[in-house]
Every structure is written in structure tokens, then in C-alpha cells.
């Protein structure tokens, strides 16, 4: 059952609560200097980092923002839940802001992520520090707001990371999952806080590291888009393919950001495997004319300042 009865503006939390939580989450990472580290804790943190990046790159970004593939309502909710567990807020909130980013990308101050119109701090994180930025205008994502479970998850997204934090501590403290009992603090610091913060910073880096920076030895600009985006092959693995940002802005509806075989897009690879299993389907391909355009390209400089 879907519904159109949701109020247009949804407030998930106060700005004060968000600021307090952001400070706590980042300060908690300093715990790495005070807790023991085992190989199991470290590798679990690494694995969960990639799960978190996949949750927002495949889920919040390619599916909820751009509808680049189809899936069942059940798996749709799983993607939304994973994104919430990763500290990426609700997927409706994520999609409304990201769609606005594409609409005004690097051509208007309405693109809150653009370092061309705002400071690096504002584009990276500062844009979040207003109540308006934290609220969700459900009218900007009516295709998602018709699902009551997504609207509910969007409002109460912060409860799920809290539950995961408690569960992580209990597993580390009272079981030998990480190699011994009594590792609750280590598990929380490394597999929850550090892993989460790094995955969040990876998302923020797309705004400040791949917009408005001239092409260089690890950045290139294949398409002459109106925005100031580049691709960064060096970040392909850490961001699971999302670093081919200029490609993405050339054709944002594609299920893949690495348009060519040599552009490693691990998110697309996982989606392809899921499509073979019929968990997802109808992955949107890159149009042939766009591929041909890219093959002929000798690279482009950034456009002039608007």
C-alpha cells in the first residue's frame, strides 16, 4: 500500500540535536588511541566501510536519487535501512538534496555542494548546519514519499545507528566474535565510529574533491558538462566507482559511473551480480552516443566561472 497523505515538510530532528551528534561521532574516533585493536576488529571495520559506501552509492544515490535500476519493495526498504544504518540519514532527504544538486550543479548558489559558489567548508559539510537543510521537502520526491515505510524511516533514521551502536558493543563485549570477549569499546570505536565517519567523508569528498578542481595526474575530464566535475581513478576503489563523477554528470540516470571497462565501478559490478540473481533488474545502460562521445574526447578543461 502506498499513500499520498504525507505532510509536505518533514522535520526529523532539531539542528541542535544534529550538531551534538556530529560532534560526538567525530570525537569518538579519537578513541583509536585508547582502545586495543585486533586484526578481526580492523578487517570488520574495513568490510563495514565498504558496506556503508555501497549503501549510499547504490541505494541513496543510484537507486533513490536517479532510479537507475528497479527492485522489489522489500529490497528497496533494505537499501533504505542500510543507508540509515550508515549514518546517511533518510533516503528521501538524501534524494531531494541530490536532485537539487544536479539541477543547479556549479551554475547557481542553489547548489549547496558547489565549491564554486561556497567555501570548501560549506560545500563539504557546512551546508548541513541549518534547520532548512535537515528538513525534508517531501514534494521534491513524490515518487519516494508515496511509500509510508520510507517516510517513516526518513523521520526516525537516527534510531537505527543508535541500535547498531548498542548491538556492536554487546557483540564485542560479551561474545568472542572479534577474537575475545571484552572488546566492546574497540568494536564500537573502530567498526562503528571510524568506519562510519570515513564512509561519510567519502560521500562529502565527491562534492569538494571532484567539483571545481582542475584535471591533473589522477583527475581527468572526459565530457564538457556545464558543471565543473572531474573523474578521479585513484578514488575508484574507496568510493566503489562513484569517483567517475564527470561521467555521472554527463548521464546521471545510468546504473554505472565507470562507463568503460577500464573504469573500475565496483558498485555496478555488485548490481550486475544482483541482477543475475533477480534481486534488481532493468539496470539503465549508458547510451551508445554518450559512449561514442567519450571515446572521441581528448579531455576538457573546467568551464569558466558562471
Where are these regions (language model features)?
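Intrinsically disordered, low-complexity coil segments
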Residues: 174-186, 212-230
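Active-site-proximal inter-transmembrane loops
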Residues: 143-150, 216-244, 251
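Non-catalytic, topology-defining segments of multipass membrane proteins
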Residues: 1-205, 209, 253-306
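Pore-loop/selectivity-filter region of tetrameric P-loop cation channels
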Residues: 53, 88, 131, 236-247
Amino acid at each position: 500500500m502506498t499513500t499520498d497523505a504525507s505532510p509536505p515538510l518533514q522535520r526529523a530532528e532539531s539542528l541542535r540535536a544534529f550538531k551534538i551528534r556530529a560532534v560526538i561521532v567525530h570525537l569518538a574516533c579519537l578513541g583509536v588511541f585508547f582502545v586495543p585493536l585486533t586484526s578481526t576488529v580492523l578487517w570488520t571495520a574495513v568490510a563495514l566501510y565498504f558496506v556503508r559506501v555501497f549503501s549510499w552509492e547504490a541505494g541513496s544515490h543510484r537507486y533513490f536519487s536517479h532510479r537507475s535500476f528497479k527492485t522489489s519493495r522489500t529490497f528497496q526498504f533494505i537499501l533504505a535501512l542500510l543507508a540509515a544504518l550508515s549514518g546517511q540519514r533518510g533516503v528521501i532527504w538524501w534524494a531531494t538534496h541530490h536532485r537539487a544538486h544536479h539541477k543547479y550543479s556549479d551554475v547557481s548558489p542553489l547548489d549547496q555542494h558547489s565549491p564554486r559558489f561556497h567555501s570548501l567548508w560549506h560545500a563539504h559539510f557546512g551546508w548541513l548546519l541549518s534547520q532548512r537543510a535537515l528538513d525534508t521537502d517531501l514534494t521534491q520526491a513524490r515518487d519516494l514519499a508515496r511509500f509510508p515505510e520510507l517516510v517513516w524511516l526518513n523521520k526516525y533514521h537516527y534510531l537505527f545507528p543508535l541500535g547498531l551502536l548498542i548491538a556492536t558493543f554487546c557483540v564485542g563485549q560479551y561474545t568472542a566474535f572479534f577474537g575475545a570477549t571484552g572488546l566492546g569499546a574497540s568494536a564500537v570505536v573502530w567498526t562503528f565510529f571510524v568506519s562510519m565517519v570515513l564512509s561519510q567523508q567519502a560521500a562529502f569528498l565527491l562534492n569538494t574533491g571532484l567539483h571545481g578542481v582542475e584535471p591533473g595526474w589522477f583527475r581527468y575530464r572526459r565530457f564538457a558538462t556545464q558543471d565543473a566535475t572531474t573523474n578521479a581513478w585513484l578514488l575508484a576503489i574507496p568510493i566503489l566507482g562513484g569517483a567517475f563523477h564527470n561521467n555521472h554528470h554527463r548521464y546521471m540516470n545510468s546504473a554505472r559511473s565507470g562507463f568503460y571497462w577500464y573504469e573500475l565501478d565496483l558498485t555496478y559490478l555488485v548490481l550486475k551480480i544482483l541482477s543475475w540473481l533477480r534481486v534488481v533488474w532493468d539496470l539503465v545502460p549508458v547510451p551508445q552516443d554518450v559512449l561514442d562521445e567519450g571515446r572521441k574526447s581528448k579531455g576538457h578543461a573546467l568551464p569558466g566561472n558562471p
